[in-house]
């Protein structure tokens, strides 16, 4: 694929960097900026270079066909989990959570631990949204941006050591990486949770303390609770069964997304989903898909030589670059310690709000989180936690690379 460079930097990357800069500067117009950037990159490739699958319209069509399952699965999950989070909120179950959490900053930290655990077996989007709903209730609607960033970090950390907790770890599993290798990421993830979770919980306690007791007279809608758990169980089962018994179908159909929507529609007669959240969720979803598509169009055909330094750097890259193609390239190249890579590309995306699908989903629920400046300023502890967690894992386990797969 021909590449045109300016001072050694491919023009594709310059256009992508300008798009990300626009998202950071104009956080009230993120969708427009992302779509404009995507249009510019596509136009440039049509006119001057080529797509990863070839030149011209045919190359674009082939590329979009190649990305169709990933994009459609993200679309279905983001839209579906938004409805799930509303079912969860309207069930009133989050309203009784304060009765079971400590009354000071430790209550906020305990909530982050819950999100971490949920994400170990749920999709991190669902875990982040459930955490966002609970935070809204227990903090009386006032949630600090630093704490929102920590919710995203907790959801990404919890999924980093589980082959069913994150798309990237599932990719490793499909490629033949043992789940026992991936689970080592929890050494770094647990440390990172503590390092970022405690400061975030203290930020939140100072901003708006946790409710000391649950409001009186709360009546939980157990039918909605059952719907929520039904969706989550079916999503988990569809993921595991497809990966174990029918891995070929994962390249053909967005299995998990379809499973989520099948349960949502099947249970609509019992409790009507809150369709009113769809317009705003749709905007956030298209924004993420635009950035993911931009990233997939970049001329990244290889990574630096596999090493712990490269893995550490990929964590920072994943904050602005979709971690799915990064993981695919790493698997193709081989020579990584997959536990380190799982933590790096999983947790690293938490450093900026649009660095992970969980962050974009939560920012749809909390629009104030769409400011990169505020996210970096108040979520400073995430980058610190990433570096400390990585080096603790390096000291405890050591870099043990596998042979190419």
Language-model-detected regions and their locations in the chain:
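Hydrophobic mid-bilayer segments of alpha-helices in multi-pass membrane transport proteins
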Residues: 10-20, 27-55, 71-83, 224-234, ...
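Short helix-coil transition sites and intra-membrane helix breaks within transmembrane domains
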Residues: 27-30, 84-92, 118-130, 158-166, ...
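Cytoplasmic-side transmembrane-helix entry/capping segments in multi-pass membrane proteins
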Residues: 31-40, 98-110, 143-153, 276-289, ...
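Juxtamembrane and boundary regions of transmembrane helices in multi-pass small-molecule transporters
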Residues: 84, 90-93, 141-145, 149, ...
